Swiss-Prot record:
A molecular-function term among this protein's GO annotations: ATP-dependent protein folding chaperone
This protein's name: Heat shock protein 70 A1
Region (Disordered): 608-640
Keywords: ATP-binding, Nucleotide-binding, Stress response
Gene3D superfamilies (UniProt xref): 1.20.1270.10, 3.30.30.30, 3.30.420.40, Actin, Chain A, domain 4, Substrate Binding Domain Of DNAk, Chain A, domain 1
PROSITE patterns per record: HSP70_1, HSP70_2, HSP70_3
Protein family according to the UniProt entry: Belongs to the heat shock protein 70 family.
Name of one Pfam family that matches: HSP70
Annotated source species: Anopheles albimanus
NCBIfam families listed in its UniProt record: PRK00290.1
Amino acid sequence: MPSAIGIDLGTTYSCVGVFQHGKVEIIANDQGNRTTPSYVAFSDTERLIGDAAKNQVAMNPTNTVFDAKRLIGRKFDDPKIQADMKHWPFTVVNDCGKPKIRVEFKGERKTFAPEEISSMVLTKMKETAEAYLGQSVKNAVITVPAYFNDSQRQATKDAGAIAGLNVMRIINEPTAAALAYGLDKNLKGERNVLIFDLGGGTFDVSILTIDEGSLFEVRATAGDTHLGGEDFDNRMVAHFVEEFKRKFKKDLSKNARALRRLRTACERAKRTLSSSTEATIEIDALMDGIDYYTKISRARFEELCSDLFRSTLQPVEKALSDAKMDKSSIHDIVLVGGSTRIPKVQSLLQNFFAGKSLNLSINPDEAVAYGAAVQAAILSGDKDDKIQDVLLVDVAPLSLGIETAGGVMTKLIERNSRIPCKQTKIFSTYADNQPGVSIQVFEGERAMTKDNNLLGQFDLSGIPPAPRGVPQIEVTFDLDANGILNVAAKDKSSGKEKNITIKNDKGRLSQADIDRMVSEAEKYREEDEKQREAIAARNQLEAYCFNLKQSLDGEGSSKLSEADRRTVQDRCDETLRWIDGNTMAEKEEYEHQMQELSRVCSPIMTKLHQQAAGGPQPTSCGQQAGGFGGRTGPTVEEVD
């Protein structure tokens, strides 16, 4: 049976795993890295995803897209998005209330939905798994922050569909990490585990009870879908922009490339400060030829981010009170996400739990993908001893309800209810002889619906005339295992019924949109493949030219006539000039040039080799001599 994979689709990095032969394999990408940057870059010639995209970001900041997870499932006027736009070098535009990303690609202006960018990252993860498994992959479990709302979950599912994946389940990141922890540690008895998951862009806290390492029951969840390592980077970048202004009277924030180089250096410095008390930043010619050398201490970094670090404790308190537990009843505190390596974050959490030691035993970058891979295996019916008894019980992160008279939020499903779940309540009309009711569905914790998030609405009409309060309208909320909601309303007297899956029409892609994006994704994939083939053909042609020219200076070349030497030299120079002037040529054009060059030069080189026979045979001129950027050649990384 084809393997099902688990994908941790992260804000800054993504990771993929598969469960086979009784264990989870975290799969390295084509660069040998077990996590892949969630970056997509568009240039005049090609589209790059992952490491290749992140490596060229300073050269092409306005067309390199990242942070799609901070856009997905949100509205353009969301204050969080408006604040983020100040930090992003790429352009975000308003398309009917939805945020879309605008880039220049192959000389044209293109607009992409966040789901499309995320789908490109998912495609990269899918291809990474396929290369490792040697077979095509269709089924996947994708993780989301526990605190993602309905529209963000739907949008993530859509991204999977655009990438050509059958998304078997959307599961919560801390729940996946708990699965990794529980299975890895062979836990005995009943343990209350707190998962503290602080990643690149999101923050979750979940409390689970794990029984005998097989029953995983989420008791409560809390978090902030907009807090993570990138926010700490932003603070450091702002600090150095101010310092640069003070020292050199120049404003870095107006220069996208300089700002990107500074951000890359800050990200590196932040990592250094997790193991050292001081980090050095050295950037040559940062702006207007100024070399910028500076230092930052761990204490200074902690001061810059002190309010953000402290804010991680509020969701911990909220989760404890929702789970009706006190601090002393938590057995294990498990750290997940790269940002939990920050010493101050660890010490604040440890002090909150009165000095209790934190559990650092699982890999914070890989735990979520590990758990997702286990869940994928369970859902595809894998009967391996290690996982056959595992049962996962998750909860709804936010309360769900409808608006009743006066704009009041009447909850049907309370937050932290077990999912899947179903709740029914009876409502009635507000006025005499009211012919219909409008059912407006909201999620959130506030008493009034205006302060909560509208998910969708529908009308139930055809109610027989009756005094107010007499008709009985039965409203049923059905929340599935992905945390996605179905709502039904039924008038008991007439039997009229209406239901919807909350598709959040304002924020959600239509099926037609998804179909269009799937075909576009296929087109981009074909273009990428053609581009790779063209580059390989160009490298081969270039290598052939250089090999020929080398042969003219090599041993025995003096035996060639001057006319032959001149012919080879001129044809090689002419071909190299053609390559320089035709960087966008197709594979066939390069192959044609290769044939022409070979037709003229091969007979001359054969003469040379025959005359030189007896000496060591030179290497064949046709083989690729490790070009730059070809599949076999080295990839070149920009260094600050």
